[in-house]
């Protein structure tokens, strides 16, 4: 199931809802994708270091249980929270992250951003800039509890990027961030979110089907 949350969504409230959903689910619970835009907020992951918060100003900071360092969420950015049963899909965490990245790349290509790419050793999706620099356009951060994943990814659509200057994005000093608008792609948060959710649902559904076929002894 794919659903949009009320916007702007309060980060702490959505995080609590994800934890509640995950704690209550069982083997038969359907997977869900939650889409939203957040009010401005910095989030610091489990291994996040305070020194990467350079100048948060008046933007609130939330320490959460996802992986990764610090990032920023705000209007003009779509969040896709993927509440997936990884055991049902037969996915390890690394395979799951790869699936999220591949689905994001497919979405960007569908939107016409063919040059988007991954960066070895640095999760997320990047766009080459003049001079060869890679600027980050999508950030990933996940949590897996008892085989159930939550949190997900953030894709920059058309937003005020200046709050990223108040942090070392994802723990990398001087890492540049970019959005679709700056890359010449004009689209809405709603359209980008729907395309992204469709790619994520398709990729995860294929993994679930392949896992079921393997357990049944049927060639995939």
Swiss-Prot record:
Annotated substrate binding sites: 66-73, 139-141, 152-154
CDD domains (alphabetical): LipB
* One GO MF term: lipoyl(octanoyl) transferase activity
The EC number(s) given in the record are 2.3.1.181
One biological process term in Gene Ontology: protein modification process
Q: Where is the BPL/LPL catalytic domain?
A: 27-208
Query: Which domain of life does the protein's organism represent?
Result: Bacteria
Q: Which UniProt keywords apply?
A: Acyltransferase, Cytoplasm, Transferase
Enumerate the InterPro entries for this protein.
aa-tRNA-synth_II/BPL/LPL, BPL_LPL_catalytic, Octanoyltransferase, Octanoyltransferase_CS
Which reactions fall under this protein's catalytic activity? octanoyl-[ACP] + L-lysyl-[protein] = N(6)-octanoyl-L-lysyl-[protein] + holo-[ACP] + H(+)
Pathway stated in the Swiss-Prot or TrEMBL entry: Protein modification; protein lipoylation via endogenous pathway; protein N(6)-(lipoyl)lysine from octanoyl-[acyl-carrier-protein]: step 1/2
Task: List the subcellular locations.
Answer: Cytoplasm
Read off the NCBIfam families from this record: lipB (TIGR00214), PRK14342.1 (NF010922)
Per the entry, what this protein does is:
Catalyzes the transfer of endogenously produced octanoic acid from octanoyl-acyl-carrier-protein onto the lipoyl domains of lipoate-dependent enzymes. Lipoyl-ACP can also act as a substrate although octanoyl-ACP is likely to be the physiological substrate.
Q: Which family is this protein grouped under?
A: Belongs to the LipB family.
Something else known: In the reaction, the free carboxyl group of octanoic acid is attached via an amide linkage to the epsilon-amino group of a specific lysine residue of lipoyl domains of lipoate-dependent enzymes.
Put simply, this protein is called Octanoyltransferase
Q: Which organism is it from?
A: Bordetella pertussis (strain Tohama I / ATCC BAA-589 / NCTC 13251)
Give the classification, highest ranks.
Answer: Bacteria, Pseudomonadati, Pseudomonadota, Betaproteobacteria, Burkholderiales
